[in-house]
């Protein structure tokens, strides 16, 4: 999927780029049975207070129900009926029609086309888009949509252009290298999908103007030093100031390199190498 640029007829178009959507199926509305309404929370929690800042507005969306698991469809072939846009994630999605007639959405891997036949299960062919247990995938293969707990569905590597690589297999665990540089042990019975995720040009898109951020539901980010003392530890002062202390969050937590991960987290034993700085 390529990048589309615009002639600078207005100032806002000068730096704006968008995806061309050439790889998507034409004229396909999302399948009604696989969508549901999505109420926009504007960053509020159940009590109505802001729990996530800088959220609000944005275009209406319908949530697409994605099958991250594919376990209950082992050994049932499925045909790719369409590749569609999903406003709720950076990756595109593919509509699968199984041999038994059921339809499901999955994250669209890079390189699949309408009409391809995909399969899941321990005996599925080693082919892009097929989902297998990690123990059945050859070393050196790129994978995505990786389970961390058997039966829970894929949790790792689900965004556009993402992939991980199988480095080794020893005993009950497989060593996987993530795109962040982290090397991690994952139980061999967990399933993953072969190949990279498509829509890799998503990272190269330039928003170009503030209005597009608002369409996406993103509100402005205000600097702490521009606030009042009641709103932020960096706020206040006469004239422009530097904040007067080391950088902290609005709640006083040190930032800019301060580690917040618990020192005795249960998953530490599965991490061989931490991610790159």
Swiss-Prot record:
GO terms for cellular component: large ribosomal subunit. Pfam families: Ribosomal_L2, Ribosomal_L2_C. Residues 258-277 have a biased composition (Basic residues). The keyword RNA-binding applies. One of the primary rRNA binding proteins. Required for association of the 30S and 50S subunits to form the 70S ribosome, for tRNA binding and peptide bond formation. It has been suggested to have peptidyltransferase activity; this is somewhat controversial. Makes several contacts with the 16S rRNA in the 70S ribosome. HAMAP family: Ribosomal_uL2_B (MF_01320_B). This is Large ribosomal subunit protein uL2. It comes from Borrelia garinii subsp. bavariensis (strain ATCC BAA-2496 / DSM 23469 / PBi) (Borreliella bavariensis). The gene is rplB.
